[in-house]
Amino acid sequence: MSFKPVVALVGRPNVGKSTLFNRLTRSRAALVADYSGLTRDRHYGEGRVGDTPFIVIDTGGFEPVAKTGILREMARQTRQAIAEADVVVFLVDARAGVNAHDHEIAQLLRKSGQQRVVLAVNKAEGMGVGNATSEFHELGLGTPYPISAAHGDGIVDLIGLALQDLVEPEPEPAPDAADLPPDHRIKLAIVGRPNVGKSTLINTLLGEERVIAFDLPGTTRDAIEIDFERDGRKYTLIDTAGLRRRGKVFEAVEKFSVIKTLQAIEASNVVLLMLDAQTEVSEQDAHIAGFVLETGRAVVVAINKWDGLDIDQRERIEREFRRKLRFLSFAPTHTISALKGQGIKPVLKSVVAAHAAAFAKLSTPKLTRELHAAVEQQPPPRKGIFRPKMRYAHQGGQNPPLVIIHGNALDAIPDSYRRYLETRFREAFKLDGTPLRIEFKSSRNPYTQES
């Protein structure tokens, strides 16, 4: 199995990195826009241009606010992302021209060892190609390509060039839950920021015998997959760059890589998100959790180092979790001590349940009955003089489950009512641990019909 390619957007502030990021990822972001509490300031996302899927990172999210030199502003994670990405898109500003910061970043890129850098000259709309790009040749990074992130000009060609020879055919769709054999392995990614205890938990899961290492993958874009078994259930651990080889076995070490984390999330069936009970829920925690939600992966939360807290501290971390990660309210949450091996069995039980929920089959008759019962108890609000009418529902996909609702005047269903229906479907089908997406399809334009 190979990971999706990763595109890192690099450039000084205000050259349009966020605009390009939003254009590349907007179709995916729209799927989860209604989740309460989900940060709008996204740094990681799933992108697609035509039939080409990829992961995109806006490295601007890693830059401190400090007004020091541009190289000092670029955090360690930015430099790591530059080195580990499959391709770097270096954005410059056609209207501002080349400046000293651009030269410093170009020098950093040359020293990084990154072999694939595409120079994108943004804000080139209304300018001739020569006028927009000529002076950027002096950066020494090859041909500059004019684009307009705001208007979408040149984006398809830019990404096609960036991902040339990197794109592989998309994998076959995952099988239905009913078609999965009893010994089907759950692909599990354990993610979390540095020093949260991932390595301790992984070593506990792998057990005293460890696991025999087969041939290591040949390239960094291949996933390292480690099979293990607990309580008769088979799992495949997808590495997040925290495993090292010792002889013929792998041992987990505490290491963090944004790119490897995002790729492992993409490749998994279930994500185990680890938080540190002894530190605050960070922006990075929230961004990683948001990416999990965007990809539609089932998720279980484990709050580690719980054993060292008093009652007041435990109440504080629970309040903070509910406030900062309330968009993960569907995810089972456990408190554990990875070091002492406490609370691990319930976590894995939730992983199994979340996996089953992600691949659950939802029958059309039961979905429709539950829909009608929900509408009878709480009808959807009117849009002007029109009352939405929901006729029937059916399943449109799995991993995550997608429910498609058909009817009239459904174009303006508010997010609050969507969440109400989600709650009803979750309770009816026991869909704990998986995102649930709802799509409305109107049979006719509600503004051309009588109420």
From Swiss-Prot:
GTP 2 binds at residues 192-199, 239-243, 304-307. Residues 360-444 form the KH-like domain. It holds the Pfam family KH_dom-like. One of its GO terms (biological process) is ribosome biogenesis. Keywords: GTP-binding, Nucleotide-binding, Repeat, Ribosome biogenesis. Residues 5-170, 186-359 form the EngA-type G domain. The keyword Nucleotide-binding applies. InterPro entries: AAA+_ATPase (IPR003593), G_ENGA (IPR031166), GTP-bd (IPR006073), GTPase_Der (IPR016484), KH_dom-like (IPR032859), KH_dom-like_a/b (IPR015946), P-loop_NTPase (IPR027417), Small_GTP-bd (IPR005225). GTP 1 binds at residues 11-18, 58-62, 122-125. GO terms for molecular function: ATP hydrolysis activity; GTP binding; ribosome binding. Associates with the 50S ribosomal subunit. GTPase that plays an essential role in the late steps of ribosome biogenesis. Belongs to the TRAFAC class TrmE-Era-EngA-EngB-Septin-like GTPase superfamily. EngA (Der) GTPase family. NCBIfam families: GTPase_EngA (TIGR03594), small_GTP (TIGR00231). This is GTPase Der. The lineage of its organism: Bacteria, Pseudomonadati, Pseudomonadota, Betaproteobacteria, Burkholderiales.
